[in-house]
């Protein structure tokens, strides 16, 4: 066996395996809507759900927290019942300093036979932000990529949230039946 360990891009595989984390990637959000051929449903971070239950919060309070998180794009940073340490644990992919993602990939690289599919996550500043904020963002993106270039064999995707996004006017989940346009065997 020439290769003993490879890390594939596993977003689809994580869904098939029942909502596990997407391999080496951090979660994009703690709550999000997953759309499939059979409809849409809300996916929640099961570890965060356990923590909220452990805190003894009522079902109504927990549901309000999930709704607030959905409005905040899956972020827990404004959830008052969580400690600062808990907020650190449940940061979304864009809230994590991307240098850490590169550093972790660098540390595990010697144990991986092939190159890793390392994705980086950024949130662009809003168009209304000052020029200095935009300059800092560009410098940060540049610094992370230079750091990655010197530490890793390659980087895979640059994922960014849009500078402008539609208002989240309704977080209610709507079931939509999608047309079966592709072979179901090819979905994985």
What are these regions (language model features)?
Residues 5-177, 187-188:
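Catalytic alpha/beta core of large soluble enzyme barrels
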Residues 1-3:
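Short acidic, Pro/Gly- and aromatic-enriched capping/linker segments at domain boundaries
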Residues 180-183:
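Residues immediately within or flanking Cys/His clusters that coordinate Zn2+
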């Amino acid at each position: 066996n020439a290769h003993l360990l490879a890390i594939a891009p596993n977003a689809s595989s994580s869904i098939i395996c029942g909502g596990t984390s997407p391999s080496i990637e951090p979660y994009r959000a703690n709550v999000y809507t997953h759309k499939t051929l059979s409809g849409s449903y809300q996916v929640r971070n099961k570890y965060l759900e356990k923590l909220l239950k452990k805190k003894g919060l009522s079902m109504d309070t927990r549901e309000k927290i999930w709704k607030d998180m959905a409005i905040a794009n899956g972020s827990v940073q404004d959830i008052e019942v969580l400690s600062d340490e808990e907020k650190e644990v449940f940061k979304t992919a864009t809230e994590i300093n991307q240098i850490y993602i590169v550093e972790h990939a660098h540390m595990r690289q010697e144990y991986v036979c092939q190159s890793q599919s390392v994705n980086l996550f950024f949130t662009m500043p809003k168009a209304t932000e000052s020029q200095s904020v935009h300059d800092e963002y560009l410098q940060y993106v540049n610094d992370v990529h230079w750091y990655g270039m010197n530490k890793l064999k390659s980087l895979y995707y640059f994922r960014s949230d849009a500078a402008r996004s539609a208002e989240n006017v309704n977080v209610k989940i709507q079931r939509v039946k999608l047309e079966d346009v592709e072979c179901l065997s090819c979905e994985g």
